[in-house]
UniProtKB/Swiss-Prot annotation:
It comes from the Bacteria. The keyword Oxidoreductase applies. One of its GO terms (molecular function) is NADP binding. Its EC number is 1.2.1.41. It catalyses: L-glutamate 5-semialdehyde + phosphate + NADP(+) = L-glutamyl 5-phosphate + NADPH + H(+). One of its GO terms (cellular component) is cytoplasm. It comes from Photobacterium profundum (strain SS9). Keywords: Amino-acid biosynthesis, Cytoplasm, NADP, Oxidoreductase, Proline biosynthesis. It is found in: Cytoplasm. PROSITE patterns: PROA. This is Gamma-glutamyl phosphate reductase.
Length: 418
């Protein structure tokens, strides 16, 4: 597999995609959605191979859930693609304009980034999400999925290629690196002659490797410890509902709750009641000394927190718990322990809420809501290519607009500079 050739082909495809009409791009997306449903048997059979291999390797149930496709999820993926069709095409839109003193009309116009390289682990839906968003925005994409979803991704890319052909778009608009060789990842990270952006989706190790080895701009995202702080003024019963949703709905998601911080003024009341609720989901509590004293005899599974536990993105039914004095200590803890993704405060105190929102350094900050809302579809952006936790170019769920840049367009009447 020659990545140099893939990069060159992707760049040529990107040049063509930049001028393709929205209707033609939407046609390709509609075909992708239809083909997903028409080929569900082949896709699910391929996914079953990946699931069996994951089980044989000893992968946890929570992580296997990331790999799993079923008929309901496949229909959901197809509908997500159809939702992208309904979204406005940002390409060509004017951000702003003005007329200069010399008569030139100067504007900023949205344009595609060009070629986007995406390296991701697990989650076969990412293959479709990225392809759909890149096509809608006129970007070519080079995808490299994890070996754990190899068979699923190969089938999904077949669907995409069928759609590209039927819509008369370049086959190189979406390319997939089939070989799981890590050296190919290193080569992709150095294709700066052809690739304009790298987006890694996976654990901290993948992000670190991309950041340290890429000669291409990298969007860092997905990894981060998600926190909820339960303030002294919070509604206890409703807070338990939110914490349960954030932790137990889908613990393998990157926006699932990792660490719960509880005001010392309500910890004695709140934590035993929370344990009673989360015991039903077999949640393991990893607690500091103060939290342990309130959970002992209440939590079905409980252990003392050790070094590194509050720096762990659990991706499972494990929850770190710490008792803090107030919102200031909660914020200090979050800053120390990589709070960059999604964080929330549960409170009925406006001042506490404002202090938390202003001080939290996360890409998404919530007041009285679950961290599980950090998602492109939930934000009304359609699907997402990633959740960026950095501050430059894009932040939070990356939808269509985040896959564009802009160019300056000057229009005049044969104007020359004096």
């Amino acid at each position: 597999m020659n990545l140099e050739h893939m990069g060159k082909a992707a760049q040529e495809a990107a040049f063509e995609l930049a001028t393709v009409a929205t209707a033609q791009k939407n046609q390709a997306l509609a075909i992708i959605a239809d083909e997903l449903e028409a080929n569900k048997d082949a896709i699910l059979a391929a996914n079953a191979k990946d699931i069996n291999a994951a089980r044989e390797s000893g992968m946890t149930d929570a992580l296997i859930d990331r790999l799993l496709l079923n008929e309901e999820r496949l229909t959901g993926i197809a509908n997500d693609v159809r939702n992208v069709i309904s979204l406005n095409d940002p390409v060509g839109a004017e951000l702003d304009s003005r007329v200069l003193e010399n008569g030139m009309r100067l504007s900023r116009r949205r344009v595609p980034l060009g070629v986007v390289g995406v390296i991701y682990e697990a989650r076969p839906n990412v293959t479709i999400d990225i392809a759909a968003l890149c096509l809608k925005t006129g970007n070519a994409s080079i995808l490299r999925g994890g070996r754990e979803t190899f068979h699923s991704n190969v089938e999904l890319v077949k669907v995409i290629q069928v759609a590209l052909k039927k819509a008369d778009l370049p086959a190189a608009s979406v390319q997939y690196i089939e070989k799981p060789d890590r050296e190919l990842v290193s080569q992709l990270l150095r294709l700066d002659q052809y690739v304009d952006m790298i987006i890694p989706r996976g654990g901290a190790g993948l992000h670190k490797m991309c950041k340290e080895n890429s000669t291409i701009p990298v969007i860092i995202g997905g990894f981060g410890i998600s926190h909820i702080y339960v303030d002294h003024s919070a509604d206890i019963s409703r807070s338990i509902d939110v914490v349960e949703n954030a932790k137990a709905q889908r613990p393998s998601a990157c926006n699932a709750l990792d660490t719960l911080l509880v005001s010392e003024k309500v910890a004695e009341t709140f934590l035993p009641r929370l344990a009673e609720r989360l015991n039903k989901s077999n949640v393991e509590f990893v607690a500091d000394d103060a939290a342990y004293s309130f959970l002992e005899g209440k939590a079905a599974t409980l252990r003392h927190a050790a070094d590194g536990d509050f720096d762990t993105e659990w991706l499972s039914f494990t929850l770190g718990v710490k008792v803090v004095a107030d919102v200031a200590e909660a914020i200090a803890h979050m800053r120390k322990h990589n709070a960059s993704h999604s964080d929330a405060i549960l409170t009925n105190d406006i001042q506490s809420a404002e202090r938390f929102v202003n001080a939290a350094g996360s890409a998404a900050v919530y007041v009285n809501a679950s961290t599980r809302f950090t998602d492109g579809a939930q934000f009304g952006l359609g699907a997402e290519v990633a959740v960026s936790t950095q501050k430059l170019h894009a932040r939070g769920p990356m939808g269509l607009e985040e896959l564009t840049s802009y160019k300056w367009v000057g229009q005049a009447d044969y104007l020359v500079r004096p």
